[in-house]
Amino acid sequence: MKAVALPIQPPYPVMDAELVGELPRGREWQYEPKWDGFRCLAFRNGETVELQSKSGKPLARYFPDVVAMLKSLSARRFVIDSELVIPVDGGTSFEELQLRLHPAASRVRKLADAHPAVMIAFDLLVDASGRSLAAKPLKDRRKALERFHADFAKDVKRLRLSPATTNIKQALEWLRRAGNSLDGIVAKRLDLGYRSGDRTGMVKYKVIRSADCVVGGFRYLEGTKLVGSLLLGLYGEDGLLHHVGFTSSIRDEDRKALTARLVKLRRPPGFTGRAPGGPSRWSTERTGEWEPLKQVLVVEVAYDQFTGGRFRHGTKFLRWRPDKAPSQCKFDQVERRSPGPEAIPVRLR
């Protein structure tokens, strides 16, 4: 990244959030939607614009549309903390964001033209006068961000102000009405400054969803003959069973009995549609040999996101579902529901 003559320089560690099982309550907390996108710090000084990822890596080459949008603002100095999302079919698409991470500039430009990204701003670290706000409490930074947006981006469709509230009921209502389109809720202490590289005073509550899946196969635990992971499938409209992910959260004391049960059910093909081992940008499991199973077992798993036809991360085993027919395990239970225009108070198009 280029040097930027501002009080805050890239790479700058972002303030991160601690994962919690329940949102904190109290008027000292501000609640915001947890968008399903790419965290992005945006730096501008004159004609120099840099975008930084959560991990500190440069993003500008992958989002030329965002760089151009920021250069179009009359404010010539600022640092904004934000989330990049790509609106598709009334919702947002994490898969489209992933496609931007391509080495060919021509491909990136084509993707940007087809699906421009939107920046959802939720913090202002350097204002238009070039003054650092990082040490100021969030309540003051939020007011400054709202003034900045009103003065410089009110009519800019691809720079949106993330909604915020001190009413926890309102925050939970966003989750309820937005369906699967939000990743959760973030809560921030209003009295604290921006804690770069720290998790103090900022927590995230993630939505955990569940789905019933067919066990189409399994993999052995490395170096053993005990089951290591169950391979999960869902039936598509084509009537085929497609591999959508895995769960490896099996208790050690259950592995021997479960392995014996699964071995008796070994039968190809296991998956009649998309099978394990194919390319996937979400895969975190090691590809390799797997054992196909007769399509009779149904398991309920917990997951955070389902994108691009599969679970983005490994799922958590919840329970067996002997009461559920495999044919009932379809994609409709995991498809992302797009929010209506009233679901959350920010329009992406």
Placement of each model-derived feature along the sequence:
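Catalytic cores of nucleic-acid ligases and guanylyltransferases
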Residues: M1-R349
